Amino acid sequence: MNVLIVYYSMYGHIHRMAEAVAEGVREVPGAEAVLRRVPETLSPDVLEKMGAVEPQKAFAHIPVATVDELASADAIIFGTPTRFGNMCGQMRQFLDATGGLWVKGSLVGKAAGVFTSSATQHGGQESTILTFHTFLLHQGMVIVGLPYAFAGQTRIDEITGGSPYGASTIAGGQGERLPSENDLAGARFQGRYVAQIAAKLNG
C-alpha cells in the first residue's frame, strides 16, 4: 500500500513533520511512505532574500511531486505551512493542476489528511486545514484527521500544535522553534491513522 506524503516546506518545519508522518505510516504492516515536495514557485532571488536557500538544501534530495503520482497512491497526506490562514501558494498552484484527475475521478475514495505549521499559536492552523479539506471533498476523498485518541493535543503544560483536523507545529515568528516531540508524535499518529484507514478502505 502506497501512502504519498506531498508537502511544501520553506524553512524545514513542514519537512520535519513530513518525516514524522512517514514514520507513522511505516508502522502499519504493508504500508510504504513516499515523500514528495511540490514545485517551488518563488525565484532564487526571492528565496535568498527570505533566507530560505540554505534551509531548503536539507531536503533538496526529496523528489518533486507530479500530479500523476496522486492518482497512483492509495492514500495521500498533504503538508503545507500556513499563509494568512490558508495553504501556501506553492501548494495551491500544484492542486490547481489536478483538474484532469477530477474529471476522471482518480482520487475518489482515497484516504487523505493534512498537517500544517504557523508562526504563532493562533496563526490560522485550523483554518488552513479546514479550507484544504474543501479541495479533498471536491476530489471525493475520505478525510482523516487527528482524533482525540492522540492525547498529546490536549496538553496545556507546553506550547503545542495539533487539533482534531490534523497535526501541526508552531515555528515562531523567526522560524526559531523546531517541532517539539509532542508535535512530531501527533504527526506520527496521523500518518499511522491515515494508513490504517486506507488499509480498511482498500480491503
UniProtKB/Swiss-Prot annotation:
InterPro entries registered for this protein in UniProt: Flavodoxin/NO_synth, Flavoprotein-like_sf, Flavoprotein_WrbA-like, FMN_Rdtase-like_dom, NQO
EC number: 1.6.5.2
Named cofactor requirement(s): FMN
Stretches assigned to the Flavodoxin-like domain: 3-194
GO function term, MF aspect, one: NAD(P)H dehydrogenase (quinone) activity
Enzyme type, top EC level: oxidoreductase
Catalytic activity from the UniProt record: a quinone + NADH + H(+) = a quinol + NAD(+); a quinone + NADPH + H(+) = a quinol + NADP(+)
Entry binding sites for NAD(+): 11
Residues reported in the UniProt entry to bind FMN: 9-14, 82-84, 117-123, 138
Stretches assigned to coiled coil: none
UniProt GO cellular component terms: membrane
Cofactor note: Binds 1 FMN per monomer.
A Pfam match: FMN_red
Residue numbers binding substrate: 102
UniProt KW keywords: Flavoprotein, FMN, NAD, NADP, Nucleotide-binding, Oxidoreductase
Family statement drawn from the similarity comment of this UniProt entry: Belongs to the WrbA family.
NCBIfam families registered for this protein in UniProt: flav_wrbA, PRK03767.1
HAMAP family in alphabetical order: NQOR
PANTHER family hit by this protein: FLAVODOXIN-RELATED PROTEIN WRBA-RELATED, FLAVOPROTEIN-LIKE PROTEIN YCP4-RELATED
Protein name in UniProt: NAD(P)H dehydrogenase (quinone)
Source organism of this protein record: Geobacter sulfurreducens (strain ATCC 51573 / DSM 12127 / PCA)
